[in-house]
Amino acid sequence: MATDNDSFPWDQDSILSSDMFSATSTELCYENLNRSCVRSPYSPGPRLILYAVFGFGAALAVCGNLLVMTSILHFRQLHSPANFLVVSLACADFLVGLTVMPFSTVRSVEGCWYFGESYCKLHTCFDVSFCYCSIFHLCFISVDRYIAVSDPLTYPTRFTAFVSGKCITFSWLLSTIYGFSLLYTGANEAGLEDLVSALTCVGGCQLAVNQSWVFINFLLFLIPTLVMITVYSKIFLIAKQQAQNIEKMSKQTARASDSYKDRVAKRERKAAKTLGIAVAAFLLSWLPYFIDSIIDAFLGFITPTYVYEILVWIAYYNSAMNPLIYAFFYPWFRKAIKLIVSGKVLRENSSTTNLFPE
């Protein structure tokens, strides 16, 4: 992400000849074109490794989130307002794996953008939009979990399908409008005309964002993050108190089984814990990138290119992490995967399969 800083010595030739990570030689992205960007290709070994690592991340994001969406949408037992939020979150991560990561793989490994100027801007819009869409979804999911844990008996009447739909609509609309309007209006480049001119070359896809918009980007990340941290802190305090109450009651009464309220509370606490881990994974993935964007915006591109690329791909890999988290913590998801992969979902009445242990 490019930013404006008067004290930083921007030189057009040095920008066009800057290399990506450590490379073996210097070439042009388009040998027969004037104003072609310079590329510094990797040797075959590192290239193969990078393609494998980045390609695996993209494939995992696509296939893993597709399994999440298929599981929840197919099996009626999983149809709930909370799970509809999870499906929508998986859709955003799926689109990152489908429309962003494959093209970023080529750009990161080859050091050039070969997909045209139009898709460069569209690719960046997808990147920005789906990132913020995930943030907003996770924020709403944390609020949903708070309601479920704090008052599990009245939760179904408070967080309905209609409320879930409004949260989903808000997340997609706001993130899409922000991402596309920011880049297609050129507001991000205001005051950076000289820098944009210096960065422009055939085979490049650099995003120039001025300090004001970098700060706005960070706020759009920070505010939902603070909400999530606050809400999950309250959730775990409530969960701890509930666990102590249940233990105290168990000692006072010899019950053969837990009450309905206790079972519901236990289930909601487990769901909150799992989704809390998903939120923590998201923050650990994206926070370094956003901090780095602030540093670069106000200190003038002090981050080495290879460090920036690493931070970007750590953030991208978050789109592949949620399905792994669900698979590790949710027995119903593992069972759903087996039914989908084995083709048993094609059988009649498979949508009514019981995925929860008795």
UniProtKB/Swiss-Prot annotation:
Entry annotated with the keyword Glycoprotein: yes
Disulfide bond positions: 37-201, 120-205
Reported tissue expression: Specifically expressed in neurons of the olfactory epithelium.
Subcellular location: Cell membrane
Sequence intervals crossing the membrane: 48-68, 84-104, 122-143, 167-187, 213-233, 275-295, 310-333
Entry GO CC: plasma membrane
One of the Pfam families matching this protein, by short name: 7tm_1
Molecular function in Gene Ontology: trace-amine receptor activity
Keyword list, A-Z: Cell membrane, Disulfide bond, G-protein coupled receptor, Glycoprotein, Membrane, Receptor, Transducer, Transmembrane, Transmembrane helix
Sugar-modified residues: 5, 34, 210
Ranges per topology, Cytoplasmic: 69-83, 144-166, 234-274, 334-358
Summary of the knockout phenotype: Mice lacking Taar2, Taar3, Taar4, Taar5, Taar6, Taar7a, Taar7b, Taar7d, Taar7e, Taar7f, Taar8a, Taar8b, Taar8c and Taar9 show no visible phenotype or behavioral deficits. They however show an absence of aversion to low concentrations of amines such as 2-phenylethylamine, isopentylamine, N-methylpiperidine and cadaverine.
Side Extracellular, residues: 1-47, 105-121, 188-212, 296-309
Free-text function comment from the UniProt entry: Olfactory receptor specific for N,N-dimethylalkylamines trace amines, such as N,N-dimethylcyclohexylamine. Trace amine compounds are enriched in animal body fluids and act on trace amine-associated receptors (TAARs) to elicit both intraspecific and interspecific innate behaviors. Ligand-binding causes a conformation change that triggers signaling via G(s)-class of G alpha proteins (GNAL or GNAS).
Domain notes: In addition to the well known disulfide bond common to G-protein coupled receptor 1 family, trace amine-associated receptors (TAARs) contain an unique disulfide bond (Cys-37-Cys-201) connecting the N-terminus to the extracellular Loop 2 (ECL2), which is required for agonist-induced receptor activation.
Protein name: Trace amine-associated receptor 7b
